[in-house]
Structure formats: structure tokens, C-alpha cells
From Swiss-Prot:
It comes from Bordetella pertussis (strain Tohama I / ATCC BAA-589 / NCTC 13251). GO terms for biological process: 'de novo' AMP biosynthetic process; IMP metabolic process. Pfam families: Adenylsucc_synt. The gene is purA. This is Adenylosuccinate synthetase. It catalyses: IMP + L-aspartate + GTP = N(6)-(1,2-dicarboxyethyl)-AMP + GDP + phosphate + 2 H(+). Homodimer. It is found in: Cytoplasm.
């Protein structure tokens, strides 16, 4: 039973990822004692700007930038030991204390070289039909987890068990690689040697994360649960099959960190003022004209990990409504509002025409979404700059009207507005921890 009152917040992307979660988690980390990653892998990067300096985090929670905040990688994350240790070294080179403040769940599924080999070979074989994976082994690792053949972090410290499980799983993957995908097999000895070489560096950080999070709650400590990607990429609720391999809705925080659902009191939905998507998949409000190119250029829309250009379009309020319902969102944070500065008019997606009928929420499945024609509502733009504004009343009138219409369409209030990449360029209408 929890002895003291703590407040725990889940931060979720409401679109197809790249909404600006990293900056907001970094800003909110000032109010917490722990930050938790609960799903995904090193396929998605969070970009932070601290005093004008760019930092990209792929696995380690954004709270690592704050002294006194403990960071946790929960069991729902698929973990590449090599990628994690490389990221730690990069942060240490920048002067950050990482290892004493990072805990890794002992039951995280491992990403190993054969997962990467399978991922890349599959995409190469699909050609034009590819989904757009980052090729980092995320999907194949989750497949092993669900098929109950995965190696986990705790197996690194039991070499005999590691060898036994590796032989079984590699027999399967090498058959797929050679007989179906036409690729080269992966050497068991090379996988084992690499894993065993990395294990000692990982060992001091391996913990029972679920129990430690429970202990922090008993002490009344505030926790922040940091989602990766976005709700429309969720393996169940996204535009399937053009999705990621994990559940990235707010409910996944409970299972992916090992905490009870009653521990999650507030869900903050991060929403870009327009919409972007990386890779393949339907995108009803996509702009393939000069306005789309303008959004991409001004918004610097390139993936932080892959460098891939992002497709851009108007904010899809009906897709946002789906995310609001899926996640039980308490309030929204609108990011990159300044990218819309200078547009004479702005369009907002309020629904779709599907087979001649109006629908006010995103349909399920890629085929249905591809058939949906966006219904757009035109709003007046603004000429004034919104960059760096920290008071809502000082926003241009039409910018405020745009935000109010977004809130009306999706049915939840806007609690935060980001007006620039630095953490202090934020308008606070209701603080998730203090409001």
C-alpha cells in the first residue's frame, strides 16, 4: 500500500512519433525523482536542446540530463547492450553522470546481432512493399519475446543458460535467414563472445525495476513515464501494418514498467501543431506541395536517429481524437506552433469522408485509412512570430483561436504550448504535476 502521495505522469506521443516528447520530458523532469522508459528500443530518438546544445537520446530516458533524477529502462523495452553502452559513453564524454543513476530491468528482452540481420534481410526482400523499419532489430526481438524464445538481460549473467537458449533461437533464425531470406547465417560464437564481453559493463545497472519503482511510490516520489514513438504507431491501435512492434499507448506504461494502472494519474499527450510521418503508410492530411515542403524546411523534419525526411501535413484533429480516447489523455501539449508562423491560412482536419459518409475519428487499419478523404476546416493564420513566447495571452489572436479549435475538435484541454526547442520556451496553462 502506498504510504505517501506521489503523482505520476505518462507522456505519450499522439501522432506518428516525432512530436517533441524529449523536450517536454526534459522540462517535466525538474518535478520528479524518476523517469521511466517502458517500450520500444533504440529505433526512436529524443532530441533535446539544452542551452543551445543538441543532445539525442535513444534508450536512456531524458531525465538523465537532471542531477538527482534516477532513470529506469523498464521490461517493455527491447535492449541492445551495445547501443546502450555506446549511448552511455557519449553522455559521459559530455560530462554527465549516467551509470550511478540508470537502472535496467533484468527482464528486458535483448536485441542481438541476428535480430538486426533478419530485420535488414526482410526489408531488402520486400522492396517496394517495405514498411520502413529502421533496421535495428526491434521487430524481430519483439517477435522472439512473444514466441517465448527471447534471451533476456538476466541471461547474460548465466553463461550456460545463455548458450543453451542461444543455440535454440539461432537455429530458428539462421534457417529463416538462409532458406527463406537468402542471407548469410549468423555465428553463434560471435554473438556469444560479443554479449559476454558487454555483460560486465551492464551488470552494475541491472535491477528489479518494478520493485524499485514501487518503493519510490511508497516514499511519495514523483515518477514520469516516457513513451517512445506515437499512439498511431501502436501495434494494435495504429495504422496496421504500418506500425511499430510494441504497444506505445499510455496503458503500456503499466505493463512495460511493472507498475499498477492506479499508479498513473495524469496522461500528457504531445501533439505537433501540424502532422508528420516517417516511412510508409497512409496519411490523410499529407501535403505534397510547397506548403508541405515549407513545414519540413522550417520544422527541420528529419529523423533524429535515421536522418530520414519526414512527410508533412496539416494537423489531423480526427486522428488526434482517436489518440485522446485510446490514451485517456488528461491534457495536450502543442509543440512547434512557431512553424505555422507566417501562413495566411491554416487547415485543420476535422474528420473524413469514407464511402460517402462522414466520420469524425480515424478508422482502424491502414486500408481503411487509405480510403479516407480528409475533411479540412480553414482557419486564419497569423503573421506575428510565436517563437519564445511564454505567456498564452501574448500569442497572436489567431494562434490562440487555432489552439482553441484544436482542443474543441479533440475534446481535451491544451495544458502546455511549446514555442521553441529550449526547455524554457514553454507556455504553461496547467502544470501536469502542480496543477
Amino acid at each position: 500500500m502506498i504510504r505517501k502521495m506521489s503523482k505520476n505522469v505518462v507522456v505519450i506521443g499522439t501522432q506518428w512519433g516525432d512530436e517533441g516528447k524529449g523536450k517536454i520530458v526534459d522540462w517535466l523532469a525538474e518535478s520528479v525523482q524518476g523517469v521511466v522508459r517502458f517500450q520500444g528500443g533504440h529505433n526512436a530518438g529524443h532530441t533535446l536542446w539544452i542551452n543551445g546544445k543538441k543532445t539525442i537520446l535513444r534508450l536512456i530516458p531524458s531525465g538523465i540530463m537532471h542531477d538527482g533524477v534516477t532513470c529506469f529502462i523498464g521490461n517493455g523495452v527491447v535492449l541492445s547492450p551495445e547501443a546502450l553502452l555506446r549511448e552511455i559513453e557519449e553522455l559521459e564524454a559530455a560530462g554527465l553522470d549516467v551509470r550511478s543513476r540508470l537502472q535496467v530491468s533484468e527482464i528486458c528482452t535483448l536485441i542481438l546481432p541476428y535480430h538486426v540481420a533478419v530485420d535488414k534481410a526482410r526489408e531488402a526482400r520486400k522492396g517496394e512493399g517495405k514498411i520502413g523499419t529502421t533496421g535495428r532489430g526491434i521487430g524481430p526481438a519483439y517477435e522472439d519475446k512473444v514466441a517465448r524464445r527471447a534471451l533476456r538481460v538476466q541471461d547474460l549473467f548465466n553463461p550456460a543458460l545463455f548458450d543453451e537458449k542461444l543455440a535454440e533461437v539461432l537455429d530458428y533464425h539462421n534457417f529463416v535467414l538462409t532458406q527463406y531470406l537468402g542471407a548469410e547465417p549468423v555465428s553463434a560464437n560471435e554473438v556469444r563472445d560479443q554479449a559476454m564481453a558487454l555483460a560486465p559493463a551492464l551488470a552494475p545497472m541491472v535491477r528489479d525495476v518494478s520493485s524499485n519503482l514501487f518503493a519510490l511510490q511508497q516514499e511519495g516520489k514523483n515518477l514520469l513515464f516516457e513513451g517512445a514513438q506515437g499512439a498511431l504507431l501502436d501495434v494494435d491501435h495504429g495504422t496496421y501494418p504500418f506500425v511499430t512492434s510494441s504497444n506505445c499507448v499510455a496503458g503500456a506504461a503499466s505493463a512495460g514498467a511493472g507498475v499498477g494502472p492506479q499508479a498513473l494519474q495524469y496522461v500528457l499527450g504531445i501533439t505537433k501543431a501540424y502532422t508528420t510521418r516517417v516511412g510508409s503508410g497512409p496519411f490523410p492530411t499529407e501535403l505534397v506541395d510547397e506548403i508541405g515542403a515549407r513545414l519540413a524546411t522550417i520544422g527541420k523534419e528529419f529523423g533524429s536517429v535515421t536522418g530520414r525526411p519526414r512527410r508533412c501535413g496539416w494537423l489531423d484533429g480526427a486522428a488526434l481524437k482517436r489518440s485522446v480516447r485510446l490514451n485517456g489523455i488528461s491534457g495536450l501539449c502543442i509543440t512547434k506552433l512557431d512553424v505555422l508562423d507566417g501562413l495566411e491560412t491554416i487547415q485543420l482536419g476535422v474528420g473524413y469522408r469514407v464511402n460517402g459518409e462522414f466520420r469524425d475519428v480515424l478508422p482502424y487499419g491502414a486500408h481503411a485509412v487509405a480510403q479516407a478523404q480528409a475533411v479540412l476546416e480553414e482557419l486564419p493564420g497569423w503573421t506575428e512570430s510565436t517563437v519564445g513566447i511564454t505567456e498564452y495571452s501574448k500569442l497572436p489572436v489567431n494562434a490562440r483561436r487555432y489552439l482553441e479549435r484544436v482542443a474543441e475538435v479533440c475534446g481535451v484541454p491544451i495544458d502546455l504550448v511549446s514555442t521553441g526547442p529550449d526547455r524554457n520556451k514553454t507556455i504553461v496553462l496547467r502544470h501536469p504535476f502542480k496543477g
